[in-house]
């Protein structure tokens, strides 16, 4: 009998699929669960086997996610609008591991639980087939055109126990938590406080607290004076920033497939790290470097959002981002206060900021030299306007 490898989270969608694939496609099911955040791997494995999976594979990939994926996003100041790409960034890692496990176990089918309305179906399928075009991808929710109500009814009819996980649909990893469904889909209503688990809404926060982040070659290397690996810094900052109201993103999002959606995210650590990194870049890189980098950063972010992590152009951009971050070393001090990140100090051995030159109280910079610069700088614009005005009068 053929086998299908199911990317299994333990939630409603993928729990229903274990039975559905066996029943509708006459395949044995092997599940793959990746811990990218807070997954209880043993509990999920036990559940998959009870549902009829012939094997349940679990992998803890949090450190790999931080070191090989999040690190590249930090270099690239990865944002899609306001969104730090937390879910989008995890999908290529999941696809990579799924292809590897499928090849090791001679499995020719990979199934995922994404709907036909979202971005993840694209991210999974492009990534999987970019890595191995011989693997066939199965998308039961899309192919069966299932709604959440359909899934619940199927689970009930087949005695599939699904733990109630509240009124919201949640996806989380160490870089962020996305919240969908329920009242969030009504854009004329405020998001209820019960949607948030990582971030205390700003109105309930205290007097704030300072944080200090040191960067080495564009990546965080210490937090509040303590050296840590990137994963540990992210874990600690999720707690510190979250209790100070940092990281709630509430936005109208333009999905890859052409739909508008109301998206709510909690990304406390990501918000702080990306803000601090950008402050440091602005201190160290010159105007031309920043201009080029801003363009590449935006292009990089759109590629990740659109599921093109394994496109060859990404490798070229990653090389540029690594090169442009080689001097992004220094420290950034922020005060986290009721949802705000206030810069309280920044320094770097590569800083281009010259206090003696910019200070209005000193005479280091000869202000008179600006006159000659302006005369040359304005020439093209002034001449263009003069010529056009003269021609307008003639006609």
Curated annotation (Swiss-Prot):
Transmembrane segments: none annotated. Keywords: Amino-acid biosynthesis, Arginine biosynthesis, ATP-binding, Cytoplasm, Ligase, Nucleotide-binding. Homotetramer. ATP binds at residues 7-15, 113. Pathway: Amino-acid biosynthesis; L-arginine biosynthesis; L-arginine from L-ornithine and carbamoyl phosphate: step 2/3. The gene is argG. It is found in: Cytoplasm. Signal peptide: none annotated. GO terms for cellular component: cytoplasm. This is Argininosuccinate synthase. HAMAP family: Arg_succ_synth_type1. CDD domains: ASS (cd01999). L-citrulline binds at residues 83, 119, 123, 169, 178, 253, 265. It catalyses: L-citrulline + L-aspartate + ATP = 2-(N(omega)-L-arginino)succinate + AMP + diphosphate + H(+). It comes from Picrophilus torridus (strain ATCC 700027 / DSM 9790 / JCM 10055 / NBRC 100828 / KAW 2/3).
